[in-house]
From Swiss-Prot:
DCTP binds at residues 99-104, 115, 163. It comes from the Archaea. This is dCTP deaminase. One of its GO terms (molecular function) is dCTP deaminase activity. InterPro entries: dCTP_deaminase, dUTPase-like_sf, dUTPase_trimeric. Homotrimer. Gene3D superfamilies: 2.70.40.10. The active site is at residue 125. The gene is dcd. It catalyses: dCTP + H2O + H(+) = dUTP + NH4(+). Keywords: Hydrolase, Nucleotide metabolism, Nucleotide-binding. Pathway: Pyrimidine metabolism; dUMP biosynthesis; dUMP from dCTP (dUTP route): step 1/2. Its EC number is 3.5.4.13. The lineage of its organism: Archaea, Thermoproteota, Thermoprotei, Thermoproteales, Thermoproteaceae. It holds the Pfam family DCD.
């Protein structure tokens, strides 16, 4: 079941869903709009051979940029972080979607689930499928998070729990 704005406001007022900061225009008809944070990550090198299964840590592959603008080269991607720190209830998951206006410029994100019980800034991959450089601004609404009720409860125990700022991927050594 997708939660409406009334249900979202109720969860926020009860302290079950936390969004900090919470802007007046964040709670929409069927989800939350989240804003671009103050940093992003982009690959530090072009043409490198990346083997996720051989990596303990992928952070050295990325350059973190602190800026008021996010520059996304043509046919490339960046990792963006939300300005908001989100704490999900243990019985609510989120489905992250790019705002449709940005998709019409040629941007996309992969299907992304924000797990029940997740807490932290959300790091999301934004792909520029267009032939043009696209520049986004810090603080603009870019991510629409649709919240859905999960059956039962679960605790999130993932590697990204409590992340702050943009978080490059973990290495997959030992998982492959």
């Amino acid at each position: 079941m997708i939660l409406s704005n009334d249900e979202l406001k109720k969860l926020i007022s009860l302290g079950k869903l936390k969004v900090d900061p919470l802007y007046p225009d964040a709670v929409r008809e069927n989800g939350l709009d989240l804003r671009i944070g103050g940093e992003y990550a982009i690959y530090a090198y072009e043409g490198a051979v990346v083997r996720p299964c051989d990596l303990d840590d992928a952070k050295p592959l990325f350059r973190v940029v602190k800026a008021d603008e996010v520059v996304i080269p043509p046919r490339n991607f960046v990792l963006l972080t939300t300005e908001e720190y989100v704490k999900m209830p243990e019985d609510v998951a989120g489905l992250a979607n790019l705002r449709s206006t940005l998709a019409r410029y040629g941007l996309s994100i992969p299907p992304t689930v924000v797990d029940v019980g997740f807490e932290g800034n959300i790091t999301i991959e934004v792909v520029n499928n267009s032939p043009n450089t696209i520049v986004l601004k810090r603080g603009m609404r870019f991510l629409h998070l649709v919240l859905i009720k999960a059956e039962g409860r679960a605790a999130y125990r993932g590697a990204y729990q409590g992340q702050r700022g943009v978080t490059p991927p973990k290495g997959l050594k030992g998982e492959c």
